[in-house]
UniProtKB/Swiss-Prot annotation:
PANTHER family in the record: THIAMINE THIAZOLE SYNTHASE (PTHR43422), THIAMINE THIAZOLE SYNTHASE 2, CHLOROPLASTIC (PTHR43422:SF9)
Protein name: Thiamine thiazole synthase 2, chloroplastic
Binding site for substrate: A97, E117, Q118, G125, V190, D221, H236, M288, R298, M299, G300
Lineage: superkingdom: Eukaryota
Organism per entry: Zea mays (Maize)
Protein encoded by which gene: THI1-2
Length: 354
């Protein structure tokens, strides 16, 4: 059955914009039913057949040559590398902000998106809540993004609680990686930026294990990925954090990276979203890396700002690409007085982590 143009659009929780989708319909192996969310509306659940569709007592795999496995993995990965050697958007860092950005961008099937994540497992710190606890707290109205994804939660007056943070992370990853215009390159590190005539034009990449062992090995030159827009979502400061803005400071494109100041949840989440922007031509900064460059407060174990900051970064990237479906998420220039207040506060002698 042919779908109409209206039915092929996905509604976004970010400013209510509607973006085209390239998803296709498949026949499910389970029956979807409506299940009440605790304190809220329905969520999607599945009731599978009680028995698997094969005989477990005499199960046998189809035969395969080992070389076929090698060829399939290699051919597909090399094809992805060739395809994304010159891409529309490169997202550096696959934490909650980077994944939310990629999800929002992926709704436009004409936009090619590459996500580069140095860890084997994407998701950043969004597999757990605070202090290695399971639950994820999301302040309203960011819960609308959870509704869009179909992630269930318990409701309170001003916030919602997802019973395990991994529910959000696994859901957003499975949704966006199923789309044909997105590729995740995990276990790959970004070592540098491509800069031409004052504009960021891509990233310099290497295998993460190679990048971590430059001091023990001889010359191991990197590779490159050109991009029309780079989104840096490298998180807070640390051994592998805030690398995008640190590199901008190293090469003189920004003057300072003062670091985030002490925790203030109510101020921090609003500021993270508000200050998400294109900091230099060709490079948008999102998530906790924003606090590092602006000296905004530490956010702590709440996650709504990561989601909405990522969505905002996506629409800024769409605007930079000239896409008509972009929501204008630009912000006024930060007042010098406000920026000075952040910077002074962030220079206190304190050791902070996310």
């Amino acid at each position: 059955m042919a779908t109409t143009a209206a039915s092929s659009l996905l509604k976004s929780s970010f400013a209510g914009s509607r973006l085209p989708s390239a998803t296709r319909t498949t026949t499910p192996s389970s029956v979807a039913v409506a299940t009440p969310r605790a304190g809220g509306g329905p969520i999607r659940a599945s009731i599978s057949s009680p028995n698997p569709p094969y005989d477990l007592t005499s199960f046998r795999f189809s035969p395969i040559k080992e070389s076929i496995v090698s060829r399939e993995m290699t051919r597909r990965y090399m094809t992805d590398m060739i395809t994304h050697a010159d891409t529309d958007v490169v997202i550096v860092g696959a934490g909650s902000a980077g994944l939310s950005c990629a999800y929002e961008l992926s709704k436009d099937p004409t936009v090619s998106v590459a996500i580069v994540e140095q860890s084997v497992s994407p998701g950043g710190g969004a597999w757990l809540g605070g202090q290695l606890f399971s639950a994820m707290v999301v302040r309203r109205p960011a819960h609308l993004f959870l509704d869009e994804l179909g992630v269930g939660y318990d409701e309170a007056e001003d916030y919602v609680v997802v019973k395990h943070a991994a529910l959000f992370t696994s859901t957003v990853m499975s949704r966006l990686l199923a789309r044909p215009n997105v590729k995740l390159f995990n276990a790959v590190a970004v070592e540098d930026l491509i800069v031409r005539r004052g504009r960021v034009g891509g990233v310099v990449t290497n295998w993460a294990l190679v990048s971590m062992n430059h001091d023990t090995q001889s010359c191991m030159d990197p590779n490159v990925m050109e991009a029309k827009v780079v989104v840096s979502s490298c998180g807070h400061d640390g051994p592998f954090g805030a690398t995008g803005v640190k590199r901008l400071q190293d090469i003189g494109m920004i003057s300072a990276v003062p670091g985030m100041k002490a925790l203030d949840m109510n101020a921090a989440e609003d500021e993270i979203v508000r200050l998400t922007r294109e900091v230099v031509p060709g490079m948008i900064v999102t998530g906790m890396e924003v606090a590092e460059i602006d000296g905004a407060p530490r956010m702590g174990p709440t996650f709504g700002a990561m989601m909405i900051s990522g969505q905002k970064a996506a629409h800024l990237a769409l605007k930079a690409l000239g896409r008509p479906n972009a929501v204008d998420g630009t912000i006024p220039e930060v007042s010098p007085a406000l920026r000075e207040e952040f910077v002074i506060a962030s220079k206190d002698d304190e050791v902070v982590d996310a």
